[in-house]
Amino acid sequence: METLRAKRIAEAGEVVPVMYEGKSVIIQHVDEEQEMARIYFVDEPEREQDVPVRLLEER
């Protein structure tokens, strides 16, 4: 995924289907400079992590 698209999804305030390693995630924040996204897993909201934006897939 492109960094700008990830940032738009994070700021939209709506649920957009995004996958990371085959699991549904929510993008909380995007660091454009580092090209990293703070995500959490839909089925495990307590599991937050920072991941490279390029590894996210919009469905």
Swiss-Prot record:
Disulfides per UniProt: none
GO biological process: asexual sporulation; sporulation resulting in formation of a cellular spore
Family according to the record: Belongs to the SspH family.
InterPro entries from the UniProt entry: SASP_SspH
Location relative to the cell: Spore core
Source species: Geobacillus thermodenitrificans (strain NG80-2)
Keyword Repeat: no
Alphabetical UniProt keywords: Sporulation
GO cellular component, one term: endospore-forming forespore
Keyword rRNA-binding annotated: no
Regulation: induction: Expressed only in the forespore compartment of sporulating cells.
Protein name: Small, acid-soluble spore protein H 1
HAMAP family membership: SspH
